[in-house]
C-alpha cells in the first residue's frame, strides 16, 4: 500500500477543488509476544475535503452511503493496474 500526501489532508491551496474526494488510511498491526503477525488489517475511511459540495469550507467530512461507495470505487479504479488490493464498499482492504 502506498499512501501519498498524508500531511495535506486539508489545506488552503484551493478554494474550490473540482475533486473533493479523499480518504483517511487506517492500518492496524498485530504483535504476539513481540512478533509482528502476517496479514493486512487496513481500511480507508472515505471522506470529502468539504462539508458542502459547492465550495471548500475546509471542514473534512466522513462520507457515507452512495458517496462513500463512490470514493471506494474510485480508489479501486485508480489502483487496478498497479495493485492486487481491492477496497470493499465499507473501505476494508482485501488482498486478491
Q: Which role fits each region the language model picked out?
A:
Residues 1-25:
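Conserved beta-sheet core of the metallophosphoesterase superfamily
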Residues 16-96:
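A short C-terminal boundary segment appended to hydrolase-like catalytic domains
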